[in-house]
From Swiss-Prot:
The keyword Signal does not apply. Belongs to the RecO family. It comes from Synechocystis sp. (strain ATCC 27184 / PCC 6803 / Kazusa). It comes from the Bacteria. This is DNA repair protein RecO. It holds the Pfam family RecO_N. Keywords: DNA damage, DNA recombination, DNA repair. One of its GO terms (cellular component) is bacterial nucleoid.
Length: 271
């Protein structure tokens, strides 16, 4: 059986290896995460030099080794050049890479996750602005977690399974959110259970935004919010939605996202 194989993949991690090689992690729809050596990739004239940088999508020809595979050829398909033109978008892209490294598995197909990851990179490159970048990230987190079956539930109570809709007519209205229970909680039903650790309280605006994350594209709040709520929407509400998704993802995956902290500091300066 041949130990040479081909796959489409995107470079999600890279580091120096030996005198002139590069050790890269490739995310492939067919094989998940692949760790491979790019021989001579750090030499100035190497054809693999630019093709093994982060975010570069290649058609790879690889040789399967015992512990590390080896890149024989790489033909670039796309490289998301727009991400590098804005430091916030670049940090956001690196944030999604950290998510994929946490969700990805070796030697198993993850086609849906790959397609969502590359689609959300495209949106960061072409659609994201300083005003909506946190909304795009919140939706990317939701979609990617959903591809692996661990997205939070924002429409039904995690205890009673009853549908919960945001109440914009009562300013004091709140709904709970518990990472341990996997979603939102009707505060009235939670009284019978006693204290729920790490539970947060969400406003009607926050719940409304979170309930829209399952849509294919990022919705415009001014298009779906009731009239009474439209004037109260602020860009900061998308930040809070992303922060909740980040909090949930980090608890589910047991990892923190360093690029997200970097994005926070740069976004505050830009905005």
């Amino acid at each position: 059986m041949s130990r040479t194989y081909q796959t489409l993949g995107i470079v999600v991690k890279g580091m120096a290896f030996g005198e002139s090689d590069r050790l890269v992690t490739i995310f492939s729809p067919e094989y998940g995460l692949i760790r491979a050596i790019a021989p001579g990739a750090r030499k100035p004239k190497s054809s693999l030099r630019g093709r093994t940088e982060l975010f570069v999508v290649n058609q790879f020809l690889l040789f399967a080794g015992k512990s590390l595979d080896r890149i024989n050829q790489a033909e670039t398909q796309y490289s998301y050049p727009g991400l590098g033109q804005n430091v916030c978008n670049l940090a956001a892209g690196q944030y999604l890479i950290e998510l994929i490294l946490a969700l990805g598995t070796e030697a198993s197909a993850q086609t849906s996750l790959y397609e969502l990851f590359t689609e959300h990179l495209r949106r960061l490159e072409t659609e994201a602005t300083v005003e909506n970048i946190y909304g795009h990230l919140a939706q990317a987190l939701f979609h990617c977690l959903g591809a692996e079956g661990i997205a939070p539930q924002f429409h039904h109570c995690a205890i009673t399974a009853q549908t919960i809709s945001p109440n914009f007519y009562d300013r004091q209205w709140r709904v709970g959110f518990s990472p341990e229970l996997g979603g939102i909680v009707d505060l009235r039903s939670s009284r019978d259970m006693g204290p729920i650790p790490q539970m947060r309280r969400l406003t009607a605006m926050e719940l409304s935004l979170l309930q829209q994350l399952n849509q294919p594209a990022l919705p415009d709040p001014q298009q779906y919010l009731p009239v009474i709520a439209r004037k109260n929407f602020r860009l900061w509400d998308w930040v809070k939605a992303e922060n909740l998704m980040r909090y949930y993802a980090q608890r589910q995956l047991g990892k923190s996202f360093r690029a997200a902290v970097l994005l926070d500091s740069m976004w505050e300066v830009d905005f």
